[in-house]
Amino acid sequence: MKKKLLKSSFFYFIYKLLKILRNKKPSYHYGEFAEDVFIDRILKNIKKGVYVDVGCYHPFKGSLTLRLFKRNWSGINIDISKTSIDLFKISRNKDINLNLAVTDYDGETFYFQNSPINQQNSLIQSNEEQRKIKIKCSTLDTILEENRIENFDYLNVDVEGAELNVIKGINFKKY
């Protein structure tokens, strides 16, 4: 009965899909739902790629770029949390690590902080207990130009509801 239930479940489908994609038993993943495993499989033929991680949060926990970093990729990690970026500066010191907000304009904005390192820190206020903090903001175009990034192979955007403003700030025809 248990085996029958497992085979008919959504989890069994995911298990089989992972097994097919990796052609082996599932290994450790860093992303919350093993997205990094899929990303790594898709990009496996690119040896020294470049990633841009907007809303990077943590260099290990939940990271969708750590596997790429371990394969000698490099990139830009951007987060509104100074504490998060300080962790990246220690663990990924060859990457470009920026403490700023990515928006559809250059200047300053405010973000709302739950705690110094928290996945829910956001440009969008979700509760009245959050601290309001002023921060520099730039478009992705400006950031890439200032850091002389001419192209990138992987873009990860996880900014708690402000993704559209990030996308508005990049010229995809250029990159």
Named regions from a protein language model:
Residues 1-175:
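Phosphate/nucleotide-binding beta-alpha loop and adjacent structural elements of enzyme active sites
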